[in-house]
Amino acid sequence: MPFALHGIPVSRGVAIGRAHLLAPAALDVSHYLVDEDQLDAEVERLRAARAAVRAELAALKRDLPRDAPEELGAFLDVHAMILDDEALAREPEALIRGRRYNAEWALTTRLEELMRQFDEIEDEYLRERKTDIRQVVERILKALAGAPVLVPAPVPALAADGEAATGVIVVAHDIAPADMLQFRHTVFHGFVTDMGGRTSHTAIVARSLDIPAAVGVQSASELIRQDDWIIIDGDAGLVIVDPTAIILEEYRHRQSERALEKKRLQRLRHTPAVTLDGLEIDLLANIEMAEDAGAALAAGAVGVGLFRSEFLFMNRRDELPGEDEQFQAYRGAVDAMHGLPVTIRTIDIGADKPLDARGDEFETALNPALGLRAIRWSLSEPGMFLTQLRALLRASAFGPVRLLVPMLAHASEIDQTLALIAKAKRQLDERGEAYDPGMKVGAMIEIPAAVLLLPLFLRKMDFLSIGTNDLIQYTLAIDRADNAVAHLFDPLHPAVLQLVARTIREANRAGVPVAVCGEMAGDPSMTRLLLGMGLREFSMHPAQLLRVKQEILHAHCERLEPLVDQVLQAFDPEEQAAALRQLARP
């Protein structure tokens, strides 16, 4: 009997095959006290398990093909960094020696503490990083149990007609990027998970490998049985179990069309993004580490529109990264882009994204999303902020760098930020350090107050970048982490569209460059809408770039503008839907 499950679409395409169920690592471990004379041996047992995981991750990275997206190796590096972090190394050992916990108990105790910290994070992307920590802990637990650190690869099942299947669909409560990479040479054609969101590393790897996927499919691993025949509709986040012959035929046809589309898209990699009426559009990439620059270039990005610097600051127990460490990371991205511009956002962290090294400063925040975060926190820590500013300025000596400041809302915040940048320049002058004295400084527009103060921002800042994810959240008063109201998170809400359009149009009139760097920029269904508002600079995940470029190549901006005006004037849902249909490409 066919039935359908609904989840979150994270990677487009259609996958057809038999279900291969992955059992999660057991986190319900035994708890017992270790004898005093066995404490050293228990610590060594934990260290040996971590060493086994480290060796497996290194082997996976070593075996990556030369043409693999660079971000895949970067994700393995992230797991290796988490593995060696004191939170999973020294602190569990302290629990073994101090409380006589067995290794599994010590490890899961620390995991529970970390999970509570990450649950307080408002930002969806950073909140999803707790999944990476859990996945690393699961690997260590497997090693402690003597099980293989990497899950066994699936084997081909039989199709309905008895012939060998074209692939299998991995179904799991969750699946780590490293496991996905292990499957790359097998018949693994897609995956379905109970957990996850659009910004999880698993979802990002799926997009990088162009593997159809649906995540957040509640109870999928319980409702789907081993060897069930299933279809993933990655565009809709739909999973069809035991489909009829008619449904199978329909989706096989979609697969064929998708294969042709992929070939056409690849031919666009080196095609300039120019509209039918001759307007050049800049397509840039969002990255989180220097290693991601390769994927940006491979997709045809003309620069980095958002380098999230906060990842240098995460998972540190005792101290924040120093100036030289930050400089090397920023310069790495600049060098990797070979003269193309790199926009680096200053640390966007705080009460809703607590750092391990400063976590106690934020424990009393009653509403962390509205608390001491982003530029508010940077200005409250001028010593830390000056260190980052000096590192950013030094990197600007090696290529075009733009500095982007998050969550600005007050004139005083702008003035304080610019004053500290000037102070950082004076400090570098005193040291004889090189930097670009004309480095551009821009503002994130992600709070409604910033839109209402646009004349001030346009007078004092060199460029603007609209962070649509936070702008939607703050405009609609929606907590994206709360499933009870998540359905109200609507990028097409008339109020949101009014704010985005106003920002773009006023910036254009003032001659100030403006970009969109949130999820709206990478959604091809939004491309024509944003073009009609006047947007000429998009920044997105590299995997989204070619589909957005395809929309741009078929767009005529002058003709889109009156259609977009109709969308902006439609406040009734039915009227808006009709206006959007008029806007859609025929």
Curated annotation (Swiss-Prot):
UniProt-listed Pfam families: PEP-utilisers_N, PEP-utilizers, PEP-utilizers_C
EC main group: transferase
GO terms for cellular component: cytoplasm
The protein's required cofactors: Mg(2+)
Residue numbers annotated as active site: 201, 517
Gene3D superfamilies (alphabetical): Phosphoenolpyruvate-binding domains, Phosphohistidine domain, PtsI, HPr-binding domain
Subcellular location per the Swiss-Prot or TrEMBL entry: Cytoplasm
Keyword annotations: Cytoplasm, Kinase, Magnesium, Metal-binding, Phosphotransferase system, Sugar transport, Transferase, Transport
Xref: SUPFAM superfamilies: Enzyme I of the PEP:sugar phosphotransferase system HPr-binding (sub)domain (SSF47831), Phosphoenolpyruvate/pyruvate domain (SSF51621), Phosphohistidine domain (SSF52009)
Residue numbers binding phosphoenolpyruvate: 308, 345, 469-470, 480
Positions that bind Mg(2+): 446, 470
EC annotation from Swiss-Prot or TrEMBL: 2.7.3.9
InterPro entries: PEP-util_enz_mobile_dom, PEP-utilizing_PTS_enzyme, PEP_util_AS, PEP_util_C, PEP_util_CS, Phosphohistidine_dom_sf, PTS_EI, PTS_EI-like
Function noted in UniProt: General (non sugar-specific) component of the phosphoenolpyruvate-dependent sugar phosphotransferase system (sugar PTS). This major carbohydrate active-transport system catalyzes the phosphorylation of incoming sugar substrates concomitantly with their translocation across the cell membrane. Enzyme I transfers the phosphoryl group from phosphoenolpyruvate (PEP) to the phosphoryl carrier protein (HPr).
Domain comment (free text): The N-terminal domain contains the HPr binding site, the central domain the pyrophosphate/phosphate carrier histidine, and the C-terminal domain the pyruvate binding site.
Binding partners and assembly: Homodimer.
Protein name per UniProt: Phosphoenolpyruvate-protein phosphotransferase
Species per Swiss-Prot/TrEMBL record: Cupriavidus necator (strain ATCC 17699 / DSM 428 / KCTC 22496 / NCIMB 10442 / H16 / Stanier 337) (Ralstonia eutropha)
